[in-house]
């Protein structure tokens, strides 16, 4: 079965047609040189099944990305963010699934007690172990950029099925140009 990196689709409910918002948020919460990662193993028909991702989700009607960020972090982790940094805008494209715009945040300021998540298992993963996890190829790129850069960046990631075919930084630098086939 072909999966997709993207979750927004048309939903038909009675007489109304609902379109899932193509704007999402993702946050990497940091503590003691580790990131809080979500191992997506609990949801059926999950496009992120068996992947390790940060915490986040779709912006809902009437929300700003920051409203979504706070809501999703609390819903999925039980933590309350006290502050955060808007680090990047990630544009995902895939033929047949449209475009998704992800607001990427980091935070090292939060309160609360970690709770069980119904989407997967939450785990503090040391930063030097992140690359060994089952991540989307594009996620590896923005992890590297988060480490290397203190400035905001824009990254366009294009997937063909589950394969990353394009990664363009700030609209001009092709990050896959030297990749081995």
Region roles according to the model:
Residues 2, 8-11:
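Low-complexity, intrinsically disordered or signal/transmembrane-proximal segments
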Residues 10, 14-37:
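Conserved N-terminal beta-strand and adjoining loop/helix that marks the start
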Residues 46-50:
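A conserved beta-turn-beta hairpin within the catalytic core of GNAT-like acetyltransferases
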Residues 59-82, 92-146, 167-181:
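Unchanged
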Residues 146-166:
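Short, active-site-adjacent segments that bind or coordinate small-molecule cofactors and metal centers
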